[in-house]
Amino acid sequence: MKTRPFISRLTLSAAATLFVSACATAPTPLSYFDFGPATKASGTAIACELPPVNLPDISSPNSLESNLMLYRLLYANDQQTHAYANHRWSMPPAQLVALRIKSQLANDPKSPVRLVDNGLANPDGWQLRLDLTDFSQYFSDATHSYAQLQLRASLLHANNLLAQTTLTQQANTDAPDAPAGAQAMRVATDALITDLTGWLCKQPHP
């Protein structure tokens, strides 16, 4: 009879230890990032007239088909890709870039590029095929990094290739972490959209 209080105290102590242990090992919640709302165009507008542009979905390699936030340590092993454990993009990178292109151009009344929805493709317009080949954060050392994306753009008309180019943009981060990488990637993507528009304006009309 006298041992019951001792056993009860032992049981409560064990339960408390398990509770504290469970709290200590609880997984950190994931943080998700996108590019935020479209921004108004700044700087000098690109003056040119273009036919309607059909933009299918952007393609990407298998390594970019998930929503993992990738980075490389150039000072350690630049051939190895890493992924942040507790940070994710809100959607795969190719979808993020496609959405940004459409929202940025639609938000800019001075943009010469008139995108056509996939379901309403204009056979007389241009076909713009984009392949996302890089979308990563690069660390030059433990405290400095930059975001980089690269697109291969192919311009077609009536299934004939008119022009092709590779566009690359980088933006430095203000901190060596995932949130700063996401912010820098947005800056780099917006700059690349400007480059893409300029490249399209240089192409002769079919």
Task: Give the residues covered by each predicted segment.
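Bacterial N-terminal signal peptides that target proteins for export
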Residues: K2-L12
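C-terminal motif of bacterial Sec signal peptides marking the signal peptidase cleavage site
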Residues: F19-A22
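A structural "domain/chain start" motif
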Residues: A24-Q95, P204-P206
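Short secondary-structure boundary motifs at beta->alpha junctions and helix caps
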Residues: D78-R88, A158-G198, H205
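Acidic, proline/glycine-rich low-complexity intrinsically disordered segments
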Residues: H82, S90, A94-V97, S103, ...
